[in-house]
Structures are given as C-alpha cells and as structure tokens.
Amino acid sequence: MDLDRRAFLRIAGVSAVGAVAAACTTGGSPVPVGSTSPTTAAPSAPTTSRPPTGPPNWDDLRTRLSGGLLRPGDDAYAAAKRAFNPLFDGRNPVAVVQAATVQDVQACVQGIAGRVSIAARSGGHSYAGYSVPDGGMVIDLSAMNKVTVQGGKAVIGAGAKLKDVYAALGAAGRALPAGSCPTVGISGLTLGGGIGVLARKYGLTCDHLSSAQVVTADGKLVTASATSEPDLFWALRGGGGGNFGVVTEFTFDTDPAPNLTVFSLHFPAGSAADVLNAWQQWLPAMPPELWANLVVSGGSPVQCRVGGCYVGGASGLNTLLNNLTTNAGAKPTQRTVRSLDYLGAMKYFEGSSARQSFLGSSRIITAPVDAAKIVALADGRAGTDLLIDGLGGKVGEPAKTATAFWHRDALASVQVYAQATAKNQTKVSQSVAEVVTGLAAAGAGGGYVNYIDPALPDWKTAYYGDNATRLQDVAKKYDPFNVFRFGQSVQI
C-alpha cells in the first residue's frame, strides 16, 4: 500500500511514536550508477512470434538461474510464496523464482512465457493478491534491491522496499516522495503512480522517474525513457504494476532532502462531518508545502483525525492548522507538532512491517463532496477506515495525458481499508462494496490502481480514464500475447 493504515493512525494522533515531482530535474545527464544490468539492445519492434505452449521444463530453467527456484513440496516454498496479506496464503503458484540478476528474469520470461501466467513481485502488497497467482509463476525480485545515490540520481533495484530507499536517500541528503509503508516495494508504488506524504510539494513518485530497465514479454531487455521506448516509458508512469513487462531497475531524479514539521490533530467524537467539510475547503487553499490526510474511522461513534507534514517550521505550520480548526468549529482533543529531518520524518510515518489481513478499495475526490454522506458510510462499520489523502499542488501540474496517471485534477484519494479474516471475508467484502458505491453516489468516482479492487465494476475507467485506450495499445505492442496477465491487466 502507498500509505500504510497504521501510519495514518499514527500521524493522525492515535500514537506519537516515532514518499517525485512533475518536471523536477536536478541537472546533468541521467547516468545509471552501480547497475549490474546487462547491456540493453537498441530500440526495436517487439516480437510478433507467439510464445510456445505446453508444460514448462522446470529442470531446464533451474540450470539457467543463479537464484533459487521453489516448487510446491519444497521446504522453503510456503514461506517464499507468501505475500503481505495473509488472506492470500491459500493461493499456490506453480513456482517461485528468487531472481538474483536481470539474466534470471530474462530466463524466466524466455522459458515460461505462454506456458503459465507470470507475475513479478517486489513488496507483495497487491490489494487483490495478484502477485501470488494461483497456478502461475512468481518472479520474486526482492534480492535485486540495491540502492545507489550519486549526485541528483538514485538507481534503485526493482526489489527494493521503501525502508531501503529512504535509508539510502537520507544518508545522501536526498529525497524522493513516496509512500509510508516500509515494506512496500518501489516497483508497484512507482508503476501505479506513487501517492505519498510529499506529493503536494514534489509530485508523484512516477514523476521523478527518468528511465527504467524492462524485460519485455519476448525476454529482451530494453531501456524505457523519454527518448527510448517512449510509449513504454509513458505507460510505466501510472499504468499499474504487472503490465507490459518486468521492470528490473529504476533511475530517479531526486531533490535535496528538506527538513519537515509533522503534525497530528485528534478531534472529538461527533465532529467528523464538520472537520471533513472544512478540510476539503482548507487544503486546496494551502501552499503545496503542506500535505495533509484525514482519517474517518468507522464505528459508533465515528472518529476523525487529521495528520500530515509541512516543508517548513512549526510556527508557519501552526498558523495553517489554526485556520483549519477555526473553520471546522472543533477544538482538537490532542495536537502534536514536531520538527524532524527528512529521514526522521519518513520513519515517523512508517506503519507496521507486520503482515495484515484486510480488504481495500478506493475512490477519487475531484471537488468537495457532501461530508455528512461520507461520514455516514463509516457509521457502525467498526474496523473500516476511510483514509483520505490530500492531492493537488505539484501532482496537478502535468496534463492528465502526460503520463498514464489520470487523476491529476484530484483533490484527494479515498482509500477504503477494512480489517478482515478468512472467516468474515465475504461479509467484509460486501461492506466494502457498499462503501465504494456510497462514495460514488456522494460524488467520489474513479479509483487508484495501487489500491486495486477486483470487485470494482468500472475499474478500467476508474483507474485510467481516457488513458485506458492508449495503455491497451502499449500492452498490445509490448505484450501481444498477454504473457503478463491477471484479473485487471490492461489488455483485458
């Protein structure tokens, strides 16, 4: 998940324990640093040869790998197949390849494409469990996690987690806006867009992407950038993980790491509608240096909390927060303001690394909605949170078609996050669907592909808007035989 639920609760005031800009450049040429990738081929038309069919030759593939290959019955298989969400533990891939090199990824695609479905996995946080395909093959990229920061560039292996990325960036005095969950992979985050805690000031994670190394469906390694495979580069910035090919390495432009002031406001029960109504009017009028979210926690009564960060000092922040509380007509029962350096702030926002059982979905707010209707959706739904993540600012500067990320005009995203178990999963799923339908009826349409929902009826338009047709064209060009397929892959 881009923004972890437990992190939302922390920054919104439950606990005081202590994520890239559009058109943001740092100068200089984008020279990959520390890469172990093989030399890429010159741009060429993808193959039109249909991949072979028939059963995979696992023994042959094993001889071509420097990493491991695990199959059902192997001692380490059960642990290797596991994703973040325990609800998907019952899924059984036919194999898990623990890729160590780009050549391992190429061997997997060349040897298996067309025989079984292929899913690349970085952090394993897919809300629908698409990185654990039942009967398919998982390419686990977690060992390919090197992060090298040199000058204004960061070269990041596709298996890196956000905790790895932030540690390396912080040590170098650089910043890359991204999410809050420490075990989210850089791959899924970037490919879906990358909403994070510095989005209003610096933009989305994908907006800082300058190039990517990609193994396409024919097993070739290509460089996608503004000047090489530009259609693929466009699609990688918001088109969603699991499509088009397997990214093995990203190169990002970074910014100087700012000092930040983090904050949390916990409001009294009964004030949620007033606070949400004020928040929707307040945030768009604030400078982009301020990022804020709002959590509506389901139950009886509904609870409301606001948290976030400010690129600046506590004095300036407090003035902005006073504006919110005055307009809301509600005095916080708890108010925390704390100054931290960049790395300290990213650690402050961290949620738990522990696995979590949940169901989720999303909608997008493009203009203020009826706050009372939104709050009513949470009434009586204990264990269900509406995590409303502020957008605008730098996120809205590129045109809606400049990258595959469609929601440039959004005021906020709304993540529906519901605790669930194997026993109550069906009931919780019905509840989530009711909330999603209610959000749409209240004026919050669309959806965010990084909170992918297999039950979302309008998913293609919701995630991609008018960019959906171009994304399908890119998928047909680079994956004409649907090698990288899952329930909501863009070719479907």
Question: What is each PLM-predicted segment?
Answer:
Residues 2-492:
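Soluble FAD-dependent oxygen oxidases
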